[in-house]
Regions:
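Helix-helix packing/entry segments at the starts of transmembrane helices
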Residues: 38-40, 81, 95-102, 166-188, ...
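Hydrophobic/small/kink-forming positions within alpha-helical transmembrane segments
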Residues: 16-19, 23, 50, 74-78, ...
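Membrane-interface helix-cap regions at the ends of transmembrane helices
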Residues: 20, 24-27, 31, 45-61, ...
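Transmembrane alpha-helical segments that form core, pore/gating elements
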Residues: 49, 107-109, 113, 144-200, ...
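Glycine-/small-residue-enriched transmembrane alpha-helix faces in small-molecule transporters
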Residues: 1-36, 142-169, 290
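Specific transmembrane alpha-helical segments of multi-pass solute transporters/efflux pumps
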Residues: 17, 21-22, 50-96, 100, ...
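C-terminal transmembrane-helix exit sites in multi-pass transporters
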Residues: 48-58, 84, 103-125, 250-270
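Hydrophobic transmembrane alpha-helices of multi-pass small-molecule transport proteins
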Residues: 49, 70-72, 102, 119-139, ...
Length: 290
């Protein structure tokens, strides 16, 4: 197995973990406030990450890398969780799943601008086609207009892509598990304060389903998923492996159907299938890495 295929396979494991984030967030919001979910899950993940760093006796980040960790944290610890959780307060996880299908293109663009990866024209065409499918889907679902929920999802997706690209590149020379751990750890002071401010005493009475959902968002969506995702990006390249994210909408649609009882409409399935097809095509396109 070559590096690109290995990177895509490892990255796919991370995507499977991430694909449950939106439907599980919907379940958690039946009990918890959206802001508590966003900050609380990062707080718990940060505490676990701090313990992991202590166990591994990881050295402190260098001054050069500290700026990268801050950018990563702004993207995946704050931006994406806050914006997408707010979107899920009123939007459906099925709708959000397909809108976030634009993330591979965003990751590719950021990778090209930041790290001079050079995808072929064919790769760009396939990526743009996949992103166009997502836009068309959004317009069809909202009677020809883009809603503020779409805006939250798009900006949240861009935040995540910035964190993905910076983290994936840093993981080429720093252990991917250390990268996500430090990103969470340096965010702890803010997340501890915000978790305290958004906590409600009624949360002590949360049922097992709510607690399990919160734990999944904290330990898997915010922490363990990045073990695989960052390693996949580092091995296979940002532009190539980021295309695996196009499979995430279909995985999320299935999860929403099973966990929430969301109906798998013909429109959802058709567009998810078309988007996944672009992943298969992109695998055949040339991407040069510097």
């Amino acid at each position: 197995m070559n590096k690109e295929s290995k990177g895509m396979l490892i990255g796919f494991v991370g995507i499977l973990i991430f694909s449950l984030t939106l439907p599980v967030s919907k379940i958690a919001m039946l009990t918890f406030d959206p802001y508590f979910i966003a900050f609380g899950r990062a707080c718990l993940a940060g505490l676990v990450a701090l313990g992991y760093l202590a166990y591994k006796k990881a050295p402190l980040p260098s001054k050069k890398d500290l700026a990268k960790y801050i950018v990563i944290a702004l993207g995946i610890v704050f931006g994406f969780p806050i914006l997408t959780t707010l979107a899920m307060k009123e939007g459906s996880s099925s709708h959000g799943a397909v809108i976030l299908g634009m993330m591979p293109l965003a990751s590719t663009v950021i990778g090209v601008l930041r790290f001079k990866e050079r995808p072929s024209l064919g790769f760009w065409f396939v990526s743009l086609f996949g992103a166009t499918l997502v836009v068309v889907y959004a317009l069809l679902k909202s009677a020809g207009s883009v809603t503020y929920i779409d805006g939250l999802l798009v900006f949240g997706g861009i935040c995540a892509c910035v964190g993905y690209v910076e983290g994936g590149e840093l993981s080429r020379r720093v252990n991917p598990r250390i990268v996500i751990s430090w990103s969470l750890a340096i965010s702890l002071p803010i997340n501890i304060v915000m978790t305290y401010l958004t906590f409600n005493a009624d949360y002590w009475m949360a049922d097992a389903i709510a607690l399990t959902s919160f734990l999944y968002l904290s330990l898997f969506s915010m922490f363990l998923g990045f073990f695989f995702w960052y390693e996949g990006l580092a091995i296979g390249g940002i532009a190539r492996v980021s295309q695996v994210q196009l499979i995430q909408p279909f995985c999320t649609l299935l999860a929403a159907s099973i966990l929430l009882g969301d109906h798998l409409t013909t429109l959802n399935v058709v567009f998810a299938f078309l988007v996944i097809s672009t992943v298969i095509l992109s695998k055949k396109m040339l991407v040069q890495r510097n």
